[in-house]
């Protein structure tokens, strides 16, 4: 999505001159380092779940889906840097067919990262809701078969949507669709939270008898959601300003922070695995076994 994720350089020169805010430029080495760390961390999460049979349950499969989304966001930046490096060294023809195709694939990965995160957080929220309020029926409602079907549908939809958004990236309806998914996810989870709160008040005694792990999972989701909003909201706002007021000096002033907003997205992929590890004793044990080379049961 070139005009959506291409930075502030596309802004009108007159608007830049009318703005007193200089571009904030960060070294590419910072992006590359954070991206590498994000890929490695999320890869470790995936390997831990794959190698440990005790973690192969719906909840951790949904977490793996979020880890894949984070990893795609980091891979996007790594591949973009590699592409720029090859172009600057003269190995690629500027604006050539290969570069255009590679740009589209990389942009699709970026969109997949956002869409995958949105839907992964949504299904994690639904899973936490069922765990808390339908604990006795949980294993009959959230089966492995339904989990795999749900995740397959989500990623097929995200892939198709990502390709469509890249193809029609220069149309305003595409931008609106791209940005509207973010608040829609927030509304969905907020409604779920309100419903959970109302049910918790009316079933306080029942909720107090639930295993602590169930409530701990809800708190983990809240932390993940808060980090996601903090890291992605500035970029979503950038996209909206880029579309609807690209020449306004105040908008241009905010858009001069594009690289900081981009770094926040990269940081999201680094922070999430720490949240999993800190909140999940099972995952911590899996990490310890991986690094100490113990065999899994």
Curated annotation (Swiss-Prot):
Recorded name of the encoding gene: MC2R
A GO molecular-function descriptor: corticotropin receptor activity
Subunit architecture: Homodimer. Interacts with corticotropin (ACTH). Interacts with MRAP; this interaction targets MC2R to the plasma membrane. Interacts with MRAP2; competing with MRAP for binding to MC2R and impairing the binding of corticotropin (ACTH).
CDD domains for this protein: 7tmA_MC2R_ACTH_R
Keywords: Cell membrane, Disulfide bond, G-protein coupled receptor, Glycoprotein, Lipoprotein, Membrane, Palmitate, Receptor, Transducer, Transmembrane, Transmembrane helix, Ubl conjugation
Subcellular location as annotated: Cell membrane
Pfam families per UniProt: 7tm_1
Membrane disposition: Multi-pass membrane protein
Lipid attachment, kind S-palmitoyl cysteine: 293
SMART domains assigned: 7TM_GPCR_Srsx
Extracellular topological domain: 1-23, 80-104, 169-180, 245-256
Highest rank taxon of the organism: Eukaryota
Residues exposed to the Cytoplasmic side: 50-58, 127-147, 200-217, 279-297
Function description: Hormone receptor primarily expressed in adrenal cortex that plays a key role in regulating adrenocortical function. Upon corticotropin (ACTH) binding, facilitates the release of adrenal glucocorticoids, including cortisol and corticosterone. In addition, MC2R is required for fetal and neonatal adrenal gland development. Mechanistically, activates adenylate cyclase (cAMP), the MAPK cascade as well as the cAMP-dependent protein kinase A pathway leading to steroidogenic factor 1/NR5A1-mediated transcriptional activation.
PTM (free text): Ubiquitinated by MGRN1 that may be involved in post-endocytic trafficking and/or degradation of internalized receptor.
Annotated family: Belongs to the G-protein coupled receptor 1 family.
Zinc as UniProt keyword: no
InterPro entries found in the cross-reference section: ACTH_rcpt, GPCR_Rhodpsn, GPCR_Rhodpsn_7TM, Melcrt_ACTH_rcpt
GO BP terms in the entry: adenylate cyclase-activating G protein-coupled receptor signaling pathway
Record protein name field: Adrenocorticotropic hormone receptor
Disulfide bridge map: 21-253, 245-251
GO cellular component: plasma membrane
Stretches that traverse the bilayer: 24-49, 59-79, 105-126, 148-168, 181-199, 218-244, 257-278
